[in-house]
From Swiss-Prot:
This enzyme's EC code(s): 2.8.1.10
Spans traversing the lipid bilayer: none
Organism: Acinetobacter baumannii (strain SDF)
UniProt entry keywords in alphabetical sequence: Cytoplasm, Schiff base, Thiamine biosynthesis, Transferase
Binding residue positions for 1-deoxy-D-xylulose 5-phosphate: G163, A189, G190, N211, T212
Cysteine pairings via disulfide bonds: none
Family in the record: Belongs to the ThiG family.
Positions annotated as active site in the UniProt record: K102
Pfam assignment, any one: ThiG
Protein name, as recorded: Thiazole synthase
Top-level division of the source organism's lineage: Bacteria
Amino acid sequence: MQDTPLIIGSRSFQSRLLVGTGKYKDLNETDLAIQASGAEIVTVAIRRVNIGQNPDQPNLLSVIPPEKYTILPNTAGCFDADSAVRTCMLARALLDGHNLVKLEVLGDEKTLYPNVTETLKAARTLIDDGFEIMVYTSDDPIIAQELESMGCVAIMPLGSLIGSGLGILNPHTISIIKENAKVPVLVDAGVGTASDAAIAMELGCDGVLMNTAIAAAQNPILMASAMKKAVEAGREAFLAGRMPRKRMANASSPETGYFFK
């Protein structure tokens, strides 16, 4: 079955796996893992990674060139709307007018849970300034609807806390977000292994974004390959339509035509 492309804002993608660039041991490992993942969208923490703002330091864009990948600047490390907006403005300047960004405004350093109030405030400002916003948010369906109605081009509810590896803790609420949404819904944060990614896709999500699950694996390149396959398998399972759940057994062999009785 031929799948449709993933449409985010004005852009089209074949891969439904998005990856980050943090926590790798060096740029070579980053490069190899991203290649193994098959990802087309690579997210970069502007406040933590050099993409040209520090000319004397290694530039991440040397291994993820914008000609090959869609660079998705993110506002990781921002705890209020003003700093998130400033970070997006810097990203646009560094990337020659690039308007697609991932907005995340965090509530505290312990949980890195989204600060929904500041997220809404930043999203409104950035959308008014012409940005296309992919937004990290809680798994609250009402907040997700509000962000979509404001004009965000993708909703990114957390599966569980960033970097926790706890998987998809609230599949039911994420399913509700997906059912209500007219823009792509991508699970962001909490994926720990391939089965978590597959579950997110089986729920009907349009994609999965991850970083630590790959970078913190014992073999990041092999895990990146596993995640690619998991996202593809989960997507195919969703499109195929799973069998209904039943309380009792239902034999798979016919009940007539036995050779022996």
